[in-house]
């Protein structure tokens, strides 16, 4: 189950959020074995983000927490697509979109724990 949270320093309308959600649901399929069916998303707008000593340009910091993909398959294509998505929907310049990937070794959901070692 991926959990992707984005933080941007600009406002995000409901329509923009819904568009990002829909596109992210398709884009996660670039990572093998992942789909919108198990995708958890979070959107935080109007964050206080600074880049190169300046906060006047739109910036996106995105955390992609992904379970069971320690080989990082699909991350190049995912990065390219997410970067363009935030540019097209929110007008954030591609050079101001940053994505941090975190491997999730254990994930608890629905009262159960999932350990990636069980899936090898």
Locate the predicted segments by residue.
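Interaction-mediating elements
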Residues: 1-120
């Amino acid at each position: 189950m991926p959990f992707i949270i984005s933080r941007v320093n600009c406002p995000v309308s409901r329509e923009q959020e819904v568009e990002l959600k829909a596109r992210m649901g398709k884009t996660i399929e670039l990572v093998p074995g992942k789909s919108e069916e198990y995708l958890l998303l979070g959107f935080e707008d109007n964050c206080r983000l600074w880049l190169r000593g300046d906060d006047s340009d739109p910036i996106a910091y995105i955390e992609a927490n992904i379970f069971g993909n320690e080989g990082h398959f699909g991350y190049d294509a995912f990065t390219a697509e997410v970067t363009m998505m935030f540019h097209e929907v929110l007008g954030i310049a591609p050079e101001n979109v940053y994505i941090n990937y975190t491997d999730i070794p254990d994930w608890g959901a629905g009262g159960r724990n999932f350990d990636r070692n069980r899936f090898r």
